[in-house]
Structure formats: C-alpha cells, structure tokens
Amino acid sequence: MNGRRTIGEDGLVFGLVVIVALVAAVVVGTVLGHRYRVGPPVLLILSGSLLGLIPRFGDVQIDGEVVLLLFLPAILYWESMNTSFREIRWNLRVIVMFSIGLVIATAVAVSWTARALGMESHAAAVLGAVLSPTDAAAVAGLAKRLPRRALTVLRGESLINDGTALVLFAVTVAVAEGAAGIGPAALVGRFVVSYLGGIMAGLLVGGLVTLLRRRIDAPLEEGALSLLTPFAAFLLAQSLKCSGVVAVLVSALVLTYVGPTVIRARSRLQAHAFWDIATFLINGSLWVFVGVQIPGAIDHIAGEDGGLPRATVLALAVTGVVIATRIAWVQATTVLGHTVDRVLKKPTRHVGFRQRCVTSWAGFRGAVSLAAALAVPMTTNSGAPFPDRNLIIFVVSVVILVTVLVQGTSLPTVVRWARMPEDVAHANELQLARTRSAQAALDALPTVADELGVAPDLVKHLEKEYEERAVLVMADGADSATSDLAERNDLVRRVRLGVLQHQRQAVTTLRNQNLIDDIVLRELQAAMDLEEVQLLDPADAE
C-alpha cells in the first residue's frame, strides 16, 4: 500500500497507542469545542492534522472499505433513529430533490470542472461521485441549532444521499477500471433497483427485528439485536446489489415507529447509552482520521506533475463548485417547487431567501467522502495505476477541510443573520404530550389501584402526587399558586439530591469497612443512579 502501514502491521502495542491517541483526541477536541463554542469536527480535524505530522502516526491509514462496511451502517442507523419519521414524510419531496437531484448535479459539475483543469476524465468522474454527498455526522454536529424543518431536510438529505453517491461511485470506478460505459437509461434503472431493493431489505429486516423484540424481554439480548440490525440490513441489501444505505435508513425508521410499543424501558436505556458512546467515538475518530490524511496527501502530491500548486488550485476550484452548485440548486428547486404547487393548486410552504441561504451554506462534506476516496483501488483491471488516485485523495481532503472549517465555523453567524423564526412547534407538541400524559395518569389511577387492591389512604396519596404534577404541566406558569408549587417541588428535588449524596457516602463507607461486598454496593448504586438522573432532569422542572 505504497509503503504505508495499516494499524496492525507494527504490532499490538502501536495499535493500542493509536487507539488511545484517537480516543484522547476525540474527547479533548469535543470538550474544547463545546467550551469555546466551536464545532467539534473543526478541532478534531486540526488535532488529526497534528497527529499526522508525527512520522509513525502519519503512516497509519484506515481502509476506506472498512469505513463503508463497518462504520457507515452504525453511523447511519443511529442518525436515522434520531430523525423524525413524520418530518421526513412531510418534507419528502425536498429531501428527494436534494438527495438524488443535487447529488447528480454536484457530481456532474465537479467532474466537468476537474476535467477542464487537467484531471484525467475517469478520475474526474470518480471525484465527482466521491464529493457529491453531504455528511450525516457533519450535519448532526454542526447544524443542530437549526429549526426543526430545516434540520430535518438536512439530516434526511445527508442520510439518503449516501445511497445515491455510492451507486455513482461504483459505476464510475468500474468504468475507470476498464468496464464498459453505462448510458443514462441504464443508470436510472440502476438507481431505481438500488433504492427499491434497499427499501424492501430495510422493511424485511425491520419487520423481523420487530417480531423478535416483541418476544424478548432481556436488555442484553435486545441490545445485541440492536447492534446487529444495521449490519444485517446493510449486508442483505448489498448482497442483492441494492442500496445498503437505504436499507439501514428504512430499518431504523421502522424501529423508530414501532419502538414505543415493542421495546422495553430497560432495553431502550441500555441500547441508547451504547449507541451514544459508540457513534460518538466512531464519528470523532473519523474526523481525526480526516486530519491525519492531510499531511500525507500533501507529501504525495508534492512529488507529482504540477506538484502542490496545481493540486491546490484544482482543490479550491472544486470546493467553489461544490458550494456554488448547492447554492444554485437550493434557489432553483425552491422556485420550481412553488411553481409545481401553484399548478397543482396545493398550499405552498414559504421558505424565505435568508432561510434558503442557511440551507445552502450547510452542505458539509465529511468522512464518507474520504472513505470513498480511500476505497478507490490502487490499480485498474489491466494492472496500470489508477489514474490520479493521490490527487483524488488530496482534493477530497481539501474540500472536507474547507467546508468544515469555513462553512462549519461561519454557519452560526449565517443563522443569526437569517433571523430564522423561533421553532415553537416542538415546544407546543411537548406541552400537548405532557398534558395528555398527565391526564391519562389521573384517569388510569383509580382503575389500576382497584385492580391491585391498593389501600384507600395510599390511593389518596398517589392522587395528590399526580394532581400536583398535572397542575404544573397544565397550568399557566405566571399563576402565583402554580409558581409556589413549582418552587416547592424544586426545593424538594434539591433536598432529595442532597440526601442521595449522603446515602452514597454511607453505602461507600460500609464497602470501605468491608461490611458489604462490591456487588451489593453496585446494586444499590444502580438504583440511586436512576433516581439521580430523574432528579437532575425532571419533566416538570424544564
């Protein structure tokens, strides 16, 4: 692999050093990003670039196929699980125009630009496919403060467009390796088959997992099923030559929809904790690896024809085309959508110019593009070196760096300039859900208490507790009685938190005196942990 080491070739010790360095960089970069209000991907790329300057770290290379087959399903699954199925359905037209139309338009524009600036034609086509999708992790990390509809469109686009881009990538790489070209009609047919097959695979896996989880009430086994789900969906679709990305998305949306009725609370808490940590480390590590590749990409380009100046001009030109294509597409499709709505006499959703600017500016590229670039084969079918492979990796690295550093850091300023209306829908829906939940508790209490044979005095105590919660949820916060009740409950909450700390100290002291075992300590600690989490984030104190 051009003299470069993979992680395992220098032995387990060096591999462990790499893992420790990666995790440390992810943790430090994320903490600093939150503290100084800088998008964590920005600092992670910079920290990766510094690691890449260290000789042995600079030689480490992650296989692009590993990212596409191991990391991508996990990332897409968790992002899909945190995306609103209803919002995707309501904004499906816009998401499809972005995740298919914009991907193809970007691929064509980048390919033409690269070819015009001297890149080999097949390599230019591959570069266009690699840079065509936005990145789900980048959007989630850098655009999370956007209003719900704008964020849903960006998230939905970034989840689905990987499928479109990977089809383009497979076709362009195959042609570059020596396969016969493919016409527009055949390409459209491949897209249709890929998406329909991916949808069917996702529905099948999602349905099977739902049936299994209805019959299993064990957090560990359900957690294992949760881990297997994205990979099963991805592999099934890939084996059918269909979109694994779409299969993962569909399986996740199926489980998102049926989850509240088939997944138990303990299993949900455990699975969410696992996926939070796993995707945090995967996403962060991939951003660090983006940075690690930059010094090596510069070294490789410096020794080729035209050297670094030519490659830099090409990379900056391609970056400009990527950004400009997105801006033009957002403006054009908005006008087109309004025209179609008027023709069909449908209500038109008004999207102001400033809001369109925010959407246009949020087209970050990320680790998926880098993984695709690294997955470009070293040679063609004839044994000749793959044309401009190092140049592809360099250009992709620069585009990722510029979009994340420039667009990512300036996006908050653009959002403030846009003066986007406050998203009150989420708060209204949250209030509606809490009100209905509180009323349901009051209505159900007599029936449940009667079924369990609860004593009348205990029922009255529970009724008072639920009524107080309902008052806080339903009443106007400006009401003096409600305000007094809220203040009293907050004081009770703080007292309970303080008492919990003394309980912990007492139990820990017993363990330190060898009067109880560590297992007993952990059992009590688990119960106190749950109580503390509830007290730290109470529903009626938000």
Curated annotation (Swiss-Prot):
Keywords: Antiport, Cell membrane, Ion transport, Membrane, Sodium, Sodium transport, Transmembrane, Transmembrane helix, Transport. It comes from the Bacteria. The chain crosses the membrane at residues 12-32, 57-77, 94-114, 123-143, 168-188, 191-211, 216-236, 243-263, 277-297, 313-333, 358-378, 391-411. GO terms for cellular component: plasma membrane. It is found in: Cell membrane. One of its GO terms (molecular function) is potassium:proton antiporter activity. Its main location: membrane. It holds the Pfam family Na_H_Exchanger. One of its GO terms (biological process) is potassium ion transmembrane transport. It is a multi-pass membrane protein. Belongs to the monovalent cation:proton antiporter 1 (CPA1) transporter (TC 2.A.36) family. This is Uncharacterized Na(+)/H(+) exchanger Rv2287. The lineage of its organism: Bacteria, Bacillati, Actinomycetota, Actinomycetes, Mycobacteriales.
